[in-house]
């Protein structure tokens, strides 16, 4: 799968790497996207950090995961763990 956003059943899927798992049932992932700048036509990398709900605390730092958009779970959490694509080495 390609990095960034994808759709499944009208929900957005985000693919990113786990950068923090110090919270209980929550991981922070870094999602990187590439866009072409409208004026300068240069490819620019953008990144965003998302807080993702991990019910079983199964993610570790370095894992590549898919997160799906969901209802608000807390003040900053709006995504759930959908699938672990690749475990950290």
Swiss-Prot record:
Organism of this sequence: Leptospira interrogans serogroup Icterohaemorrhagiae serovar Lai (strain 56601)
What this protein is called in its record is Small ribosomal subunit protein uS17
Tell me, in a sentence or two, what this protein's role is. Answer: One of the primary rRNA binding proteins, it binds specifically to the 5'-end of 16S ribosomal RNA.
Q: Which domain of life is it from?
A: Bacteria
The Gene Ontology CC terms held by the record are: cytosolic small ribosomal subunit
Against InterPro entries, the record matches this protein to:
NA-bd_OB-fold (IPR012340), Ribosomal_uS17 (IPR000266), Ribosomal_uS17_bact/chlr (IPR019984), Ribosomal_uS17_CS (IPR019979)
Which HAMAP family does the record associate with it? Ribosomal_uS17_B
Q: Into which family does the record put it?
A: Belongs to the universal ribosomal protein uS17 family.
Q: Which GO terms describe its biological process?
A: translation
